[in-house]
A protein has these predicted regions:
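N-terminal secretory signal peptides that target proteins for export/translocation
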Residues: 1-17
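Bacterial N-terminal signal peptides
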Residues: 17-30
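C-terminal PAP-associated
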Residues: 36-491
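Short, solvent-exposed loop/turn segments enriched in Ser/Thr/Gly
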Residues: 60, 508, 517-524, 595-597
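Low-complexity, acidic Ser/Thr/Pro/Gly-rich terminal tails and inter-domain linkers that flank the onset
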Residues: 487-518
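Asparagine-centered strand-capping/turn motif at beta-strand->loop junctions
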Residues: 526-533, 545
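Intrinsically disordered, low-complexity Pro/Gly/Ser/Thr-rich segments with frequent PxxP/GP/PP motifs
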Residues: 555-606
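Terminal connector regions
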Residues: 596-628
Length: 628
């Protein structure tokens, strides 16, 4: 790059000068060769299983990072977890950057059921959780999500709420905003089929302890109107994107949605009239219903938004959505540099995708360096579109160009397992009857929900938070993704030496499965660094014993399993498992971090006796003393 610059610079000078400059340039480049910084690149970390609460469907995810501690992450999801199999919202909390998680249940959710989870953090680190249950309930936590306040019920009849906090230094810093889709007072949609919907806003100036509202933002004209993810610009201006959708009951031929927005410059007191962003073709309600029952996973979802909070493209607003094109979904992006007054022509993010493939369910975020991250569900490689991978790309130039997409998921999602298809009831009293409406995770949310989450922490790391179907049932996964740019030179790796890591690494198991007919035990095994040292791959696990020494000395009868999938083909002691790819793109395993899960397949000695013992040695590399 520097050499090309010199060639262009010297084009107008004399031959003698060109020779001197050429000699200087070669000397300079030779001297600087060791200091070159890499081109922008995406670095994907291991896939981390977040949910460990059973073979039950998880749908509609959200995630936020604490602005005062980027390792404190808060996620939310609908989970088919109630005692009768119905849905409730749960929170998931991490204090180590997403390596380990703890789940949180809320009493109202477990009693009444719920949906549409929202999460966020206040400007001083207070955690917020919102869910629709017996009302729109707001919860606070002043310890990062460990303990929570009692519910503050803000409304009784709402839908599709959205949450944002002003993290700027503007006049409304710290203000919490919460929108809700609700009926216009006095409307009788069930009787007249005339849709009268509006978006309202609640605001809090005391860290979520109390709210003012609802205040009407906008209303539809016999259409639905739902707020999308809210944004706050650098001066505190509130940007409220909304999706205007047809009244499907009387307009079954309508085939486009309209994305619009309103602004508030006075902290959520008054709002501008809605202005147009784009029209989004979705094919019509008949096409949507047909797609939902087709066995395909690609489905339509609303547009998503992000803003550069203060990087090199300050206040640039980004919008991404899927266009329906010849029965395939194509992910496009548009941006505005003038607070929504004008928008760039939408352009595809992955123009080289095969004609058969769909890109759907996107989410976007911008980190403090101004890097725009985008991830989505991708059916490339699967013409039947009944499974998907997770893809990610990024732009370092304000959405003008994008890096080659990276695969995030370490396994393919094929989400048609029994946990996704098992229906759960919604029980209510209606028209003098006790009714039970049944829905399964897959039938209601074949694409894992109406939306998915991603956040970017103050450390610049992106954290996608997705519903993953590798087990057949939608479970929650995340990964830490870094976008290395020219301003972030790679740190040279220290000189390393091979070592046993068995005193530095432990085994962490994802949920274990067992098939009685085949007697196969499936063990998803991760390595966790429990030392204070950085450890380096490649890592290898070697099975050293399948009988505990005490049992051997005591002549106890033991059940010894057979190993079915060792890397070296051995079926007993001496079998090895290769973890060289378990870090994904990472070059080291930091303290408290975990690898991706590698599946160990064992065959139990008996169909009904599945107790056994394993002793293993783990090897890898450590930095030579004095080399770090």
């Amino acid at each position: 790059m520097f050499g090309q610059y010199l060639l262009a610079w010297r084009s107008g000078v004399s031959a003698t000068s060109r020779l001197l400059v050429g000699v200087f340039a070669m000397a300079f480049v030779a001297a600087a060769a060791g200091a070159e910084t890499p081109s922008p690149r995406i670095v994907v970390g291991p896939n981390i299983l977040v949910s460990r609460d059973g073979d039950i469907a998880h749908c509609e995810t959200m995630i936020a990072a604490n602005p005062t501690d980027p390792k404190n992450l808060l996620g939310g999801s609908i989970v088919m977890v109630r005692p009768d199999g119905g849905s409730a919202n749960k929170a998931y909390v991490s204090f180590d950057g997403g390596s380990t998680w703890t789940d949180v249940s809320f009493p109202e959710e477990m009693e009444h059921g719920g949906g549409d989870p929202q999460v966020g953090f206040g400007i001083t680190g207070t955690a917020y959780f919102v869910g629709l249950s017996n009302g729109m309930n707001f919860y606070r936590s002043e310890d990062g999500g460990k303990t929570w306040s009692k519910a503050l019920c803000l409304s009784r009849n709402g839908d599709h709420e959205m949450l944002v906090t002003d993290h700027t230094f503007g006049p409304f810093a710290g203000r919490v905003y919460l929108t809700d889709e609700t009926d216009v007072p006095g409307s009788k949609e069930l009787e007249t089929l005339q849709m009268q919907r509006r978006v309202v806003l609640f605001r809090s100036s005391d860290d979520g302890r109390s709210f003012i509202g609802p205040v009407e933002v906008a209303r539809g004209n016999n259409t639905g109107l739902a707020a999308q993810n809210l944004l706050v610009l650098s001066d505190g201006t509130l940007f409220i994107p909304m999706l205007e959708y047809p009244n499907y009951a009387i307009n079954k031929e309508a085939s486009t949605w309209k994305a619009v927005f309103s602004l508030s410059t006075d902290g959520g007191v008054t709002f501008s009239s809605p202005r147009r962003i784009a029209e989004i073709p979705f094919g019509g309600v008949k096409a949507m219903r047909k797609s939902q029952g087709s066995g395909r996973v690609d489905q339509m979802a609303g547009p998503v938004f992000a803003v550069d909070p203060g990087g090199k493209f300050r206040d640039r607003i980004y919008a991404a959505w899927t266009d329906l094109e010849n029965d395939r979904y194509r992910l496009v992006l548009s941006w505005s540099g003038d607070r929504g007054a004008t928008w760039s022509t939408p352009k595809p993010l992955d123009p080289g995708v095969p004609a058969y493939a769909s890109q759907f369910q996107p989410m976007i975020a911008v980190n403090p360096d101004g890097v725009l991250g985008v991830y989505w569900y991708d059916t490339e490689g699967f013409p039947s579109r009944d499974r998907f991978e997770i893809s990610f790309t990024a732009s370092v130039d304000g959405g003008e160009t994008f890096l080659a997409k990276a695969r995030v998921s370490s396994a393919t999602s094929n989400p048609f397992g029994s946990g996704n298809l098992r229906p759960g009831p919604f029980v209510s009293q209606d028209r003098g009857l006790v009714t039970a409406s049944f829905v399964s995770g897959m039938s209601r949310w074949p694409n894992g929900g109406d939306y998915i989450g991603m956040t970017a922490g103050t450390d610049g790391i992106f954290h996608p938070f997705w519903t993953d179907g590798r087990s057949g049932t939608y479970q929650l996964y995340t990964s830490a993704i870094r976008v290395r740019t020219d301003s972030q030179p790679a740190t040279p790796a220290p000189e390393k030496t091979a070592a046993s890591l068995s005193d530095k690494v432990t085994l962490v198991f994802d949920p274990i499965q067992y098939d009685r007919e085949t007697q196969e035990v499936l063990l998803p095994v991760r390595l966790k660094n429990v030392s204070k040292e950085t450890l380096y791959p490649p890592f290898k696990v070697e099975i050293k014993e399948l009988v505990h020494p005490y049992s051997a000395k005591a002549h106890e009868e033991v059940d010894v399993p057979t190993i079915l999938n060792a890397t070296n083909g051995k079926t007993g002691v001496g079998a090895t498992f290769d973890y060289s790819k378990a870090l994904h793109d990472l070059e080291s395993l930091e303290p408290e971090a975990v690898t991706d899960a590698i599946l160990w397949r064992f065959k139990a000695a008996s169909a009904v006796k599945t107790s056994f013992h394993v002793g293993a040695d783990i090897t890898g590399f450590v930095a030579k003393k004095g080399a770090e």
